[in-house]
Amino acid sequence: MKRLAQLLALAAAAHAAPPESFWRALHVVETSGRHGPILGDNGRSLGPLQISRAYFTDSRVGGTYEQVVDLGFARKVVSAYLQRYAPQAWAAGDVVTLARVHNGGPAGARKAATVNYGAKVQRLCK
């Protein structure tokens, strides 16, 4: 029964999504809303949502890393990554946890270093 509940929760999470304001806030925090091949983190991140090569690989989205310069593709990558590493936050639309995982990796929601980042995204979501 517990396994069934977990499967149902995962299925629900796959169909839920954070509000549009989350995507706008993430874009603004990462690159001030700019588009294109923006390099960040000393060349380690790319595109409007500042995705690293490791993040892209972890997302398991097909295509090439260079495609993250396109905002629509970058959103697909972030969506897949967050659904993989923060499915409950995704289903609940928990923008703070989602932002912290985006910023700090799979354990980002537990890292003190991501608290301010999460708060900044949350402020912009309002």
Model-derived regions, located:
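Catalytic glycan-binding domains that act on GlcNAc-containing polysaccharides
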Residues: A17-K126
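Hydrophobic h-region of N-terminal signal peptides that target proteins for export
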Residues: Q6-A16
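Positively charged n-region of N-terminal signal peptides that target proteins for export
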Residues: M1-R3
